[in-house]
Every structure is written in C-alpha cells, then in structure tokens.
Amino acid sequence: MAKNHKVEPVGGPPSDVEHLKLESNYLRGSLTDSLANRITGGLPDLDNRLLKFHGSYMQDDRDYRNEREKQKLEPYYQFMLRVVTPGGVATPEQWLLMDSLADKYGTGSLKLTTRQAFQLHGVLKWNLKKTIQEINAAMLSTLAACGDVSRNVMCNPNPYQSELHSEVFHWSQQLTSHLAPKTPAYHEIWLDGEKVVDGAEQGEVEPIYGPVYLPRKFKIGIAVPPSNDVDVYSQDLGYIAILGEDGKLAGFNVCVGGGMGMTHGDTATYPQLAKVIGFVTPDQVLDLAEKVVTIQRDYGNRSVRKYARFKYTIDRHGLPWFMDELQDRLGWELAPAREFHFEHTGDRYGWIKGKDGKWNLNLYVQAGRVVDTEDNKLRSALREIAKIHTGDFRLTANQNLVIANVTAQKKTKIVALLKEFGIAEGSNYSALRRSALSCVALPTCGLAMAEAERYLPSLIDRLEPILANAGLQDQEINIRMTGCPNGCARPALGEISFIGKSPGKYNMYMGAGFTGDRLSKMYKENIGEDEIIDTLTPIIDRYASERNKGENFGDFVIRAGYVKAVTDGTNFHD
C-alpha cells in the first residue's frame, strides 16, 4: 500500500506538561526532596504532575475543604494509589496485602476500578513510600498506573473458563510489561534502588517512549467474544480474540482510536469508538502495539492536552493515513478482520464451572467499593476467603470480583463463608443495579463537578420501583454515572448515563448500544433528580409496552425517536 499523503506532527508550542516531562530526567524531577518536606502534606504542582507516572494522584477531601479554609489550614491533602494488575488478576496473598494496606495507610476500603485495577485512597504523603514498598514486595506495582503512558491492560477476567481465556490473559501481561516505562526513577525514589545521576548517561532510557513519553494516556483492552466486558471500542487500542477451528487462539482483530473523555462546552472534544482495522496473529501482538504507540508518540497533539488523545490524532489525519503510517513502521500488512459477535458488556453473576472442572464465582460489588458496612460485611468475607483460597481473585471491568479457579472442596468452604457473612452472589439485586457503573467523584476527585459513586445507588433506589411496576426488574439496562466528562466509568457507552455538570445536576444521555458498539446521545441538559425521574418514567413505561422481542433499551429509544443513533464521535454533538 502506497502512502496517500504526508502528514506533519501538530504545530504550536509544547504545553507546560511537555516541558516538565522533558526536564524531569526521566520522571525524577524533585520528587525525592518534595516527599521529604514535612512542612506540607502536599506536593508542588510540578512534582504532583510527575507523581502520576508513578501511580498516584494528590487529592484533598473536599468534604472538609471549606472548614479547613475557615481555620486557615491547608487542604486535607491525601493521595490515591493505583495498582497495576494486568487483566485484573491478583493472588490471595496480594489481596490480603491490599486489604491490610486499606487499614494501615488508607481509609478502610478498597476501590476496584473500571480498568481492573486496585485503588487505595487516603494515603498521607509520609506514608506513600512505605505503602509503595509494601505493594512492590507483594510483586505488584504502581508504575504507569497513571500518566502519559500505556495504562493497565484490560482483558476478560476469567482465564480459567477456557484455554482461550488463559492465552488472552497471557497477552495482557506481555503487553503491560512490554509497554511499561523503563526508567529506573521508580526504583530509585520508592524502592531505594541505586541512583543514576543523569538518566541520559545510560543511553536510550526509554526506547519506546523517549524522554517526553506520550502526549496523553493510552489505554489497551482485550475482549473475548461473546463478552465485550472491557468495552473494547472505548480503548485507544483494542484486541478482539478470535478462536480458530482447532479451538485455540488464532489471533486478534485490532481496533484503534477509541476514548471516552471530553470537555463540557467544547464540541471539538468528544467520545469516540475504535474502528476495526484488521487481524493479527499472536506473535504480531507486541510489534503492532509498539508501532501504534510510536505513531501517537510522534503525531499526537503536544500543545493542547484536551486534544491530545489518540482518537483525535486519527480523526485529524484520517484512518487511511494512519493505516499507511502503521504499515510503513511494521513492514507488513494486517490480514482482513475475521467475523466475531458480541452479546453483552456486563458480568455474568454466580458460579460458573470451567472446562478444567474448576469453579469461578462472579460477585457483585456495588460501585467497586470493597468495604464493611452495617448491613454488608463484604470486605471481611473476602478477607476470610483469601485466607483459604488457592486460586485467583480477578477484578472485572464492571467493578465486580471473580473468585476464580476454585476446587470443589474449596467451593463448599467459600459458599459457607459467604453465607456466614450474609453476602449474596448478586441475584438478589435488580438487573439495573447489577448493570451500573460509577466513578469515585466526590469527595476525593479534584475534577468532579457532581457526585457519582455516593449518589448513583440512591438514584437507582428510585428507579427500581418504576422498572418493577413496568415488569422490567430483570431487564439489563446499562446505566452509568460520572462526576465529570472525563469518562472514567465510560458513560458514553451507557444506555442511560449521567455526566456531572454541577452539584446535583447532570447531563442525561441515552441510546448507547447494549454491546458497546454505539455511543449515547444527550437527551436533557443540567437536570436534577426529580427531573431525571419525571423524564425516565414515561420512557420506561413506553419501553415496557412497545418494545420488540429482545429489543434493548438503547435500541428502543432510538427507534422511538427520543435520540439519534451515534456511531461516530464526530457526530456526538450534532
């Protein structure tokens, strides 16, 4: 294939963040000195930005912000630590370690994220190094859990369900390792590794990223049809596993250019769906990923960060240009994409027996928050299970948890423990609640404009009787809520979704595809709870009485004319 046209990288002066990365000496900056400063519980802005690459965000508890300001105190600074777990897999020993850190340094809970990672909230600055050291001692890491690099690689979390799942999990590990930053700064700062005075003296420190890394974060996910639980079309780079005639992994369809984030009021920003561009064999997976990443490295927008994601690079230059550039770098052509079929994006709850004879239990975890409450001792139950479990824990892309690779003997014991602590598999919750996703939002996320995790359950409380009255209590409807438009809970792929606009107010969207292949469309702007209920009630009632057999909610609201179908993000605001 010949090149259609030559494209130059985006012009304009590099942003302040680009200068920061360049001058950071491969992510060192002055982090060591700032961490040692006992005068403040926070970090200077420049080091705070660098800290993301090391897997942490500085936050403050916004519930206390006004009161502390009145008392002339600095904000209640604390840090969120995100732990990289490729494919969401953790051993029982690693689970117990994270559980203990939640009490030792955190706020007494664990957050399971929509990208299959752990988050630990409330860590104080003076405890950061100790926490990271304990995490690494358990063969986990926070490096590249955040920052302008390839993040935690997602995949279907049930590798013991079949040989195919096991192979796919292997590639999530390989991709995470291959694309991880190679700078020794992480080991120097956190693990007391041997210090290198000047990273440049080592030669090529970052052979893939270079000294300024990527223009923005880069997300990779691997889906295993018929489940699109990882929302593969939301990824910068997606792999769709294809089964061969021999029942083994033949390779992957590849899709590029997805992403959920946008900025309120700026129609030049939008969520986007990744496009399928071809098929690769397993031995081509790493080469393809590296070349795709380097295209974004070289052509992504480094002047304006809100336009810097890979989706804008592709949309700006065009898919034909991207394919030419990719082939030039690869030196070989992708094969034509193969047939596949997705049926759902949600989790399948309860016990499932794998082909190897072992069991997997998918547990519902509301908003991914593992915590003990007065009426739900989930954290205690999982702690006791981890003490006897000989398989794995697998975090799902829907913020739930799979207790995987369970023997028949251990299954009996785990069932007894769940009963002892009163934990249900998920069948006692409504289909709507089981299909809900939300980000953390307030009080710790500095970007949140409204509540999400703390509020969505109560909104569902009001929606459940409406659905029950319509006979839809068992109908899966993907509902998602975020406190801002950055898209952490992938709201643009919710059949019903809410994006925070201001305290108590949300933009309401509808019409995304049930299998994650169509974006939602804004239906109402800046509305509160009562208007949400008043708006959805007649739509739900009409859906119950007028839907076609097997018709999902997102498809119905388009057919009924409530919103238009959005299959490309460039039409999201039309």
Curated annotation (Swiss-Prot):
Cofactor: siroheme; [4Fe-4S] cluster
Assigned GO CC terms: sulfite reductase complex (NADPH)
Protein's pathway: Sulfur metabolism; hydrogen sulfide biosynthesis; hydrogen sulfide from sulfite (NADPH route): step 1/1
PANTHER family noted in UniProt: SULFITE REDUCTASE [NADPH] SUBUNIT BETA, SULFITE REDUCTASE [NADPH] SUBUNIT BETA-RELATED
Gene behind this protein: cysI
Gene3D superfamilies cross-referenced by the UniProt entry: Sulfite Reductase Hemoprotein, domain 1 (3.30.413.10)
MF (Gene Ontology): 4 iron, 4 sulfur cluster binding; heme binding; metal ion binding; NADP binding; sulfite reductase (ferredoxin) activity; sulfite reductase (NADPH) activity
Catalytic activity, reaction form: hydrogen sulfide + 3 NADP(+) + 3 H2O = sulfite + 3 NADPH + 4 H(+)
Keywords: 4Fe-4S, Amino-acid biosynthesis, Cysteine biosynthesis, Heme, Iron, Iron-sulfur, Metal-binding, NADP, Oxidoreductase
Lineage of origin: Bacteria, Bacillati, Bacillota, Bacilli, Bacillales
Residues binding [4Fe-4S] cluster: C439, C445, C484, C488
UniProt xrefs under InterPro entries: CysI, NiRdtase/SiRdtase_haem-b_fer, Nit/Sulf_reduc_fer-like_dom_sf, NO2/SO3_Rdtase_4Fe4S_dom, NO2/SO3_Rdtase_4Fe4S_prot, NO2/SO3_Rdtase_4Fe4S_sf, NO2/SO3_Rdtase_FeS/sirohaem_BS
EC number(s) on file: 1.8.1.2
Protein name: Sulfite reductase [NADPH] hemoprotein beta-component
Record has Heme as a keyword: yes
Protein family according to the UniProt entry: Belongs to the nitrite and sulfite reductase 4Fe-4S domain family.
Function: Component of the sulfite reductase complex that catalyzes the 6-electron reduction of sulfite to sulfide. This is one of several activities required for the biosynthesis of L-cysteine from sulfate.
